[in-house]
Amino acid sequence: MDPTLISLGALALAGAAATVSGCAEDLESDVGSQSNPNSQVQLGPQMGNIHRYFNKAISGEPVSYGLYVAVAGSVAWALINAGLNAVLALIIGSGVAAIVHGAYSVSAFLGRTVGQSQKFGQPVYMDVLTSHIGPIVGHGFIAVFTMVLAAYLAVTALGNPFPLPLVALIFGITVGAIGSSTGDVHYGAEREYQKYAFGGGIPVANQGDIDIYAEYGIRNGLDSSYFCSRLGGPLTGLCFGLIIFLDGWRSIVGNIIGGDLVTKTSIALVVGLLVVVAAMILNRKIEVFARNKYGPYRN
């Protein structure tokens, strides 16, 4: 079969895996309230808002997912070199990473909550721990497995020269950064502050004054993930999937058109710059359209 067709097929599969990974990563961070929005959850009890959110900001998402995916990639790489089937090795590696993820989540939740219990009266809700840890580990496993799968395809089928653990680390940092910058806005700026008028941002005076009541009963992280699965999660997945696909696509275009290595690299760089410029123009047009359509926030 034509090597170009094999590369295109592997790239399409890697892009699809990255899309699923980005969506699952964002929803996992919504269940556990990690990264940027967690600062508001941490401030909640200090503002008198006793809540039932799962408070587990172990670190920023880029660092934590860099760790999880690197653990999965390292275990899978060792097992593959030992002669184990690649798919089974990726599953086992992702399972080990899920255990690490769960251990960090439990310790972070208990440590951060206990630190606020005496002075600010925030209880440690054990039912929140037991009900949230499953979705956290489950979403995390999906995100890590699809991410390490994309890294494996990059190494074996797309010609990436670096070893699997290093590529997995880079991909994990990338998906964490995208989830933190793209999907968390939907959770932190909207879901946590639905009692305030939409579009007003989060003034300093309102920080920590988060919503503690849901549509029915007391709000928790599971409610947040359900809400964000309609917009924040899919947008995170789409963003990361497009990055993986377009980055690989520019390299394939360079290999098809170019002759020697320098020409291939130059064409790939030019195509990449054109994609970035097109994305900037499209982003600007969407922003101007939205401002003209809905107008400035006046209150």
Swiss-Prot record:
InterPro entries: MeTrfase_E (IPR005780)
Catalyzed chemical reaction(s): 5-methyl-5,6,7,8-tetrahydromethanopterin + coenzyme M + 2 Na(+)(in) = 5,6,7,8-tetrahydromethanopterin + methyl-coenzyme M + 2 Na(+)(out)
NCBIfam families associated with the record: mtrE
Keyword line: Cell membrane, Membrane, Methanogenesis, Methyltransferase, One-carbon metabolism, Transferase, Translocase, Transmembrane, Transmembrane helix
GO cellular component terms, A-Z: cytoplasm; plasma membrane; vesicle membrane
SUBUNIT field: The complex is composed of 8 subunits; MtrA, MtrB, MtrC, MtrD, MtrE, MtrF, MtrG and MtrH.
Its job: Part of a complex that catalyzes the formation of methyl-coenzyme M and tetrahydromethanopterin from coenzyme M and methyl-tetrahydromethanopterin. This is an energy-conserving, sodium-ion translocating step.
Pathway: One-carbon metabolism; methanogenesis from CO(2); methyl-coenzyme M from 5,10-methylene-5,6,7,8-tetrahydromethanopterin: step 2/2
Membrane topology listed for this record: Multi-pass membrane protein
Gene: mtrE
Designated name of the protein: Tetrahydromethanopterin S-methyltransferase subunit E
